[in-house]
Structure formats: structure tokens, C-alpha cells
Amino acid sequence: MVFTQDGNATYMKTKLYYNESSESKFLADILKHKLEREGIIVGDETPEIGIAIGGDGSFLHMVAANDFNTDILYIGVNNGTLGFLTEIKPTELNYFTDVIKNSNYKLEHISYEEVKVVAENGEYNFKTLNEVVVRDEYLSTTYLKVTVDDKLLENFVGDGLLVSTPTGSTAYNLSGNGAIVYSDLHTMQITPLAPINNKVYRCITNPIVLPESKVIKLYPIERTKDLIILADGKKYTIKDAKHVEIKICKDKLKCIRLNDYDYTTIINDKYLS
């Protein structure tokens, strides 16, 4: 039995998601025992609270396994990796159990992307919490016409384009020299991957941050016809692609945050401390 924020008693259903590492399994067993001891249900059905144990990959798997269900509250327990999405430390399991039991937390609403690829043989749809990467299938130079709300932004030439959410700004985007965006903002960021600039081709070489109302479309041009789509790290090959449409979903995922959660402190802790 747990207590809601208005003081009423209820039964809370949770589900644990973890990878196959021995450390994650060990933490899952400990946490399951602690939660059940407090009357919190741990099961396999669709939960009210989803708890990922591991690194950011475990968190992404949890959200995808629930098809980005926006009724679920999501949170992660870090098992020692960098983990921007997994906030709880293994040493905080007792405190975390009390937090869940007493609903003593705040909620942050975070954005995810809807990606639609239109090809000669049909339409493909993806959802991404971190990013989508669009490249030439053969990993040769990628040629893409880029539009925002159907207005030309540029004709890109380079390795590919990465479009990330604020949550994904600290993942692959950061390796591509993209900007860190605070997780409670609702934006998209276009980050060029190895853009080519010479007297023949001129590309924007800096990341561009767009508001959530915008719709990005990428059209294969010149020698690019077949695409590789990386959606949160999962690879898909699309033959004879016509265009890729990327936008922020109007619905938001709900993430549990501890009351002392502070993104500035997290950035400092992950990169500088």
C-alpha cells in the first residue's frame, strides 16, 4: 500500500526492466524485495510506474517496450554507468522505496519524436526518445534536402543528419558537437555529421535548435536513394526513400524526479566532477 500526494492510500503497480548483467539482476532482486515489503506490487502487467535498472539503454528499452505509453510514470536506477536517464543510485534504494511509497516526488514531462519515412514500397513509422540519424545506406556521402515547415533550410552534404530531443542532446548528439539542451524544454535539434563545405557544396555546420511546433523533412537528392535510419540506436534500411518527416509528439512522457533533482547539478556531476 502506498500513499498518494493527497494522502489517500492505494495499491501501486510497478514493473522492473533490466538488462542481463549480473549487477542489474542483483539490484532488481533487492529492489523487488524492498518494494514488496512496503506493499507495492511488482509484476509483469502494464504498470503505473516503470523502473529501469541499468544505464540509459535500459531506460530506452523500457519506454519502447511500453510503446511510449504516456500514462506510465518512468524512472531509472543507475548501476554504475554514466546514465543521464537513470537518476537513482544503487545506494539510494531504501530512500527510493520511501519516495515511491509516499509519492514524494515531482514529475517532469519530456518530449519524444515521431518519425515517418515514406518510400516507394510503403510507409515506416518510428518513435524515438533520444534521436534519429539519417544516412546513406552505403555510408558514403549523404545528400539531403532539408525543409522546416516545407520551407527550404539547406541542401546538406556530409555523413548524415542527426535530429535529437532535449533528452537525447547528451547522447549521440553530444559526440557530434551538438548542444546540451535542458530536459524540460520541448525542442528538436538538427546536428550535422561531418558536413562538407567547399566551393561546390555549402552546408550549415552548426547545430540548429527548433521549437516543438516545427516539422522537419529530409529528402534524398542526387546520389542518395536508399537510407539507413538509426532510431534510438536501432538500425533500419529503407530502400527508395522519398522523404523522412520528423516532429515532436504532442503527448509527453512523464518521468519521476526526486524533489532535489537539478539538471545543472547533473551536468556538472556527469562531465566535470
Regions found by a protein language model. Name each.
Residues 55-58, 80, 167-169:
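Short glycine-rich anion-binding loops that position phosphate/pyrophosphate groups of nucleotides
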Residues 1-11:
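N-terminal amphipathic/basic-hydrophobic helices that include classical n-h-c signal peptides
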Residues 35, 66-67:
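Active-site catalytic pocket residues across diverse enzymes, especially alpha/beta-hydrolases
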Residues 44-62:
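Short, well-ordered secondary-structure micro-motifs within conserved domains or adaptor modules
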Residues 163-164:
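Conserved beta-strand-loop-short alpha-helix elements that form
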Residues 11-44, 83-160, 170-273:
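Catalytic phosphate-donor-binding core of small-molecule kinases
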Residues 61-66, 173-177:
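Short Gly/Thr/Asp-enriched flexible loops that form oxyanion-binding sites at enzyme active sites
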Residues 72-73:
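Proline-centered loop/turn at the N-terminus of a beta-strand
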